[in-house]
A protein has these predicted regions:
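Generic structural signal for residues in well-ordered beta-strands
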Residues: 7, 38-42, 116
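S-adenosyl-L-methionine/SAH cofactor-binding core of RNA-modifying enzymes
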Residues: 34-96
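Short, low-complexity, intrinsically disordered N-terminal peptides in bacterial proteins
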Residues: 1-6, 56-61, 152-153
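Short, conserved catalytic or adaptor-binding loops enriched in Gly and charged residues
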Residues: 30-34, 109
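Structured adenosyl-cofactor binding patch, chiefly the S-adenosyl-L-methionine
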Residues: 107-153
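N-terminal beta1-alpha1 ligand-phosphate binding loop
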Residues: 2-30
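Short glycine-rich anion-binding loops that position phosphate/pyrophosphate groups of nucleotides
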Residues: 15, 70-73, 101-104
């Protein structure tokens, strides 16, 4: 199967040399998602550098920015898979999921987002939010391809 969509899992507030115990699991989930999309991670020192990166994303279609935000829309895994599948079917080339800075996203960043997505009302550590997002991307890919991973939910 040819894969034409790219997914980037970005996070803000990266520190050079910082240790992230979740990184191997994040990479594992993203590698396993390759049936639907090419996946990668990106780290940014600030929201400003992330927004500059967003401005430079070009292709046949504009990049879709999904910001994880406590005020965002909550979805079931099935609804998220349907949303991701619809973007794929529309021909979207690049979807960027981003975990924001510790102080939260600015109003300007929220306005640039195509979707604000929330895991719920609880506050979640940024590294854990990245892991949860990577797992949900993988789960969505398995739902879209009929893989049994999600069937035991």
């Amino acid at each position: 199967m040819l894969v034409f969509m790219q997914i980037t899992l970005a996070h803000i507030g990266a520190r050079i040399g910082s240790r992230d115990d979740y990184e191997p699991s994040i990479q594992n989930y993203l590698e396993r998602s390759s049936t639907v999309a090419r996946c990668r991670t990106e780290a940014f020192r600030s929201e400003e550098t992330f927004l500059d990166f967003l401005d430079k994303q070009q292709g046949r279609t504009p990049a879709i920015a999904v910001l994880l935000d406590s005020r965002g829309r909550q979805m079931s895994s099935e609804a998220f898979a349907a949303w991701l599948g619809a973007r794929r079917d529309e021909g979207s080339q690049h979807i960027i999921f981003a975990v924001g800075p510790a102080s939260g996203w600015s109003d300007a960043a929220r306005k640039r987002a195509h979707l604000l997505l929330s895991f719920g009302q609880m506050t979640i550590a940024h590294a854990l939010a990245r892991l949860l997002m990577a797992e949900q991307i993988y789960r969505a890919c398995t739902i879209l391809t009929g893989h049994p991973y999600h069937s035991g939910h």
